[in-house]
Amino acid sequence: MTFKVIIVGGGPVGLYMAHAFERANIDYVILEQQDTVLNISGQLLFTWPQTVRLFDQIGLLADLENVALGIHHKKRLFGDNGQVTTTSNFWDAMQDNHGYPFLPLLRSELVKILYNHLKGRESNIRVNSRVTDIRPHATGVHVHLADGSLIQGSIVVGADGVHSRTRQIMDSLVAQHALNPARLANKPMVSTFYGIFGRASNVDLGIEPEVFFESRGGGGEGGAVVQCLATKDIVQFVTLKPLPGGPTSERSPRYSDEEMDAYAASLADVAVCPGVKFGDVWAKVQRKSTRMLNQEEGFLDNWFFDRIVLVGDAVHKSTSVNGLGMTCGLHSGAVLANELHSLLSRQREKEEEPSTEELEGAFGRYQEDRKTEVKPIWNGGHAMIREVVKKGWVSWFWDRFVLPWCDMETFAKGLLVSVLLIRQGQILRFVPFEGRGGRVPWARKVVV
């Protein structure tokens, strides 16, 4: 049987991996449980320069630039009174440093572009395909679907998000078969914060366009953070505050409109920018593209077992506060694709299919590489959300007097962020590509 990857999940990470496999000449199928991979999600995804570079490598840059929101400045402010504490041109500085801009993208637009550019979009994507079981065997995997179908392949890549069914099945297999105590089932993801992703009309609000506002510490005793970015017509926003009942590993409920209204009312007096409160924004909200949900956090120990491997939010999930969730997932996908391409290239020379042991070796290298890179980012996001929602004199003193003078984003035009994070971005090693550059050279380049 020709080597075939079964990708579970048709979100940005799953679709990106399909693009990578097409360029690696690896057969694949995407299983998506919804009736379409396209949706109307109003969630805004921050696409960092190193991730824009990944998209440029597969030919998507021009289309993405056409639909991206403009962004040039960042302003932090106190949620209680709207006083601006810091202003920076961080976004423009990063483009100077790396040659690529930050691209704020609606998730729906990104998915549409990934889908439309995929050669196998008609033949290699199965919708309404909910996975119920995965059975690895000596030479491949059997994936059972809720409709009774059986899909056969060589490996399964679980790109099915924070509530990954693939992970649940893998953990069950680990519990049944793993002899190594270190390979016990993963701990569950935990939600400590919840909030609203939404969109509102900016026609009457007059929020300054192309400025990313981050309002900190307002919203009652527990504190909250509100982030927003506007054009002259719309404003995209996200809010986060601690769950009233404390941390939970239960799946996020489907919040009702009444629950969203009550949540919004608790933030009504929080300044989202000078002169505009969250209550003003909520009065102009577009409910069709607005939703409330718990935001899980977790960093798992085990990313693979047998012929099953996990990627993206299925293994490392942060809140949205630092805007790095999708970036981490896509770069994990690039590393996994590189490992599979290298292994299969060697096996093709020998005219042999890779064994389970050889596949686990590739998965292990992928896990080791990405754990080293992602864990510091995850730790930073974990600390950041807890800091920005705080109320009290320590947080006030930090935001008012310390942050303006020792902000990593403004120090030397963001040089620390460029060197420690952005320049380290992954690349598909097997796809010829030169790309753009800036003042800070990329650590990884394609050598073909």
From Swiss-Prot:
Summary of the knockout phenotype: Leads to a delay in fruiting body maturation.
Catalytic machinery residues: 227
Gene Ontology biological-process entries: secondary metabolite biosynthetic process
The enzyme's E.C. designation: 1.-.-.-
Co-factor requirement: FAD
Keywords: FAD, Flavoprotein, Monooxygenase, Oxidoreductase
A GO molecular function held by the record: FAD binding
InterPro entries found in the cross-reference section: FAD-bd, FAD/NAD-bd_sf, FAD_mOase_fung
Short name of any one Pfam family annotated for the protein: FAD_binding_3
UniProt keyword Flavoprotein present: yes
Residue positions binding FAD: 32, 107, 313
Function, in words: Highly reducing polyketide synthase; part of the gene cluster that mediates the biosynthesis of sordarial, a salicylic aldehyde structurally related to the phytotoxin pyriculol. The most interesting aspect of this pathway is formation of an aromatic product from the highly reducing polyketide synthase srdA. SrdA synthesizes a reduced polyketide chain from one molecule of acetyl-CoA and five molecules of malonyl-CoA. The polyketide chain is then reductively released as an aldehyde.
Family: Belongs to the paxM FAD-dependent monooxygenase family.
Record protein name field: FAD-dependent monooxygenase srdH
Organism whose genome encodes this protein: Neurospora crassa (strain ATCC 24698 / 74-OR23-1A / CBS 708.71 / DSM 1257 / FGSC 987)
Lineage of the organism: Eukaryota, Fungi, Dikarya, Ascomycota, Pezizomycotina
